[in-house]
Amino acid sequence: MFLQNKNVVVMGVANKKSIAWGCAKALKDQGANVIYTYQNERMKKQVVKLADENDLLVECDVASDASIQAAFETIKNEVGTIDGLVHAIAFAKKEELSGNVSDITRDGFLLAQDISSYSLLAVTHYAKPLLNPGSGIVTLTYLGSERAIPNYNMMGIAKASLETAVKYLAFELAADKIRVNGISAGAIKTLAVTGVKDYDQLISISNERTPDKTGVTIEEVGNTCAFLVSDLASGVVGDIIYVDKGVHLT
């Protein structure tokens, strides 16, 4: 197991279908101690159902700097240092995903960018003092960042911003021997995807475009995440890794 006794923070587990949960499972399979964050008490109830009894759960609302700071202070007090961070958090108002891009509201734009992109910067700011040399930060993105995907409007813009943030963070943190990368995951029926209009059609079309005509799983994304967090990925810096069964090829 290549993550034996490593402490890794996983942000964004909503339920058992979450990509973040696939990441957490893969990390645990490789021996990591997973620390979960949750937005509020309602979300905590979902995480409790999945986490092991002795796992550390910490409240962290990424819309609040004070909440992020408090979360990482708690993590520091409980485990000392960490060896990885998985950022699987995104949000946009449903009405900002479909229709005309030119109709996106200022408030909707700012909210999506704040939660989906800026949060990676904010979380990294407070996590950095805890991260050991050799640590890996991984975030989740999607093909809609670089192609115009129907009904993905605002989130596509936010994901493009997120991917650029990955590159700049990777450049900054390389001096501290901390790697930052992103995973561009294929369309999977998660809670987040169900907010996209005609999501069943999106998933069906995506699956048809894979060379083997089958969709990617949260476990496959999770395995790549575990690799990127680990020392095995020491040469992978500032990259966006496609884990979509080849959808991006066509």
Curated annotation (Swiss-Prot):
NAD(+) binds at G12, S18, I19, Q39, D61, V62, I89, K159, I188, K189, T190, L191, A192. The active site is at Y142 (proton acceptor), Y152 (proton acceptor). The keyword Protease does not apply. Pathway: Lipid metabolism; fatty acid biosynthesis. Substrate binds at A92. Belongs to the short-chain dehydrogenases/reductases (SDR) family. FabI subfamily. Catalyzes the reduction of a carbon-carbon double bond in an enoyl moiety that is covalently linked to an acyl carrier protein (ACP). Involved in the elongation cycle of fatty acid which are used in the lipid metabolism. This is Enoyl-[acyl-carrier-protein] reductase [NADH] FabI. It comes from Enterococcus faecalis (strain ATCC 700802 / V583). The lineage of its organism: Bacteria, Bacillati, Bacillota, Bacilli, Lactobacillales. The gene is fabI.
